[in-house]
Amino acid sequence: MSTEDLYQDDVESLEDYDDETAEQEHEHEHEQQWAEPDDESEYAEAEPDDDEQEEQEEQQAPSGLDSLALDLTLRCGELRLTLAELRRLDAGTILEVGGVAPGYATLCHGERVVAEGELVDVDGRLGLQITRLAAQP
């Protein structure tokens, strides 16, 4: 038998195997896709209650990093001025700020929003009462 004949036999056997294997895999994928989830499937898992969720969060947070100080910024809106408008600013000038409702501000770490809240008076000082936390990545 020549080398060419051996090669042709190998190619034919591979083609037969590939066709059968591909067909079986396709049937298996189709069955899995449309199968009903059973009680033990990942879809049937119950959501953890609040106590379990708090414990998981405490376990995930490294305690050594808890004392790390972060610089946060309180943003109460945005405005855009030309250089000429900036030069004309004087005491008593009122600037219209956009991007946030009056009395509200956004708490940020760098460019990442951490929380939103309402500006409040805390013993004569400005404070932020959190009304909504940003989703964690």
UniProtKB/Swiss-Prot annotation:
Biased composition (Basic and acidic residues): 23-33
Gene3D superfamilies noted in UniProt: SpoA-like
Pfam family, one: FliMN_C
Key words of the record: Cytoplasm, Virulence
GO molecular function, one term: cytoskeletal motor activity
Cell compartment(s), UniProt: Cytoplasm
GO cellular component terms attached to this protein's record: bacterial-type flagellum basal body; cytoplasm
Cleaved signal peptide residues: none
Record flagged with keyword Cytoplasm: yes
Record remark: domains: The HrcQb-C domain interacts with the HrcQa C-terminal domain.
PANTHER family linked to this entry: FLAGELLAR MOTOR SWITCH PROTEIN FLIM, SECRETION SYSTEM APPARATUS PROTEIN SSAQ
The family this protein is said to belong to: Belongs to the FliN/MopA/SpaO family.
Protein name: Type III secretion protein HrcQb
